[in-house]
């Protein structure tokens, strides 16, 4: 977590960001700043634009309008080197996207060698360091099929870290995991936060957001409805839309009653 001064240059700066798919306006004027070393959790209902925002930050989706800056560089500038931008941003998805025919170590060394042009020895050294970082040194020679979902996600995090990113983006990293496997992944993310990694996390893990995030952003309908400290946004939200979302998320029985049309 961060102690970054509010006067310093934001590590991530999103300015009047819009994204449309045909007639569907998914993002409708997003303004967001994330300081160096800051952890920001983005929450909201399905279809609110959370994942699209994340994908626009590293240009997996091209914004319709607006600007995105990472480390002071405008990544949405028409002349930007997109590959260079993506080398500065690590991203972890819901699905692990590991190569099944490669060992864990090879999954970490391949992108280093192809993208960063590291030699085999250096790539292997960095791979080993980052597997240790996520607590999976003993799985270096294993293949993805022999790992649990949680272990595969930790390998995916190690793979992203091996590229030396300035910021890490997480898109629902635990949503595809069985409940008993979530804890180890969140523990790794907590460790990264305490190490000072700048992190933007789309999540429904409210305990993680409460304990680790510097700020929580609630999105709905393609806009930021509420942005503040976890104790405020989660514990005492000021907007009815936020309160309604959290009541359904934290009390599934209430959500079922509403869906059934009960009073």
PLM feature spans:
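ABC-family P-loop ATPase nucleotide-binding domain
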Residues: 1-18, 253-263
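ABC family nucleotide-binding domain
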Residues: 9-230
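Generic structural signal for alpha-helix starts
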Residues: 5-7, 73, 239
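C-terminal boundary and immediately downstream tail of ABC-type ATPase nucleotide-binding domains
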Residues: 232-263
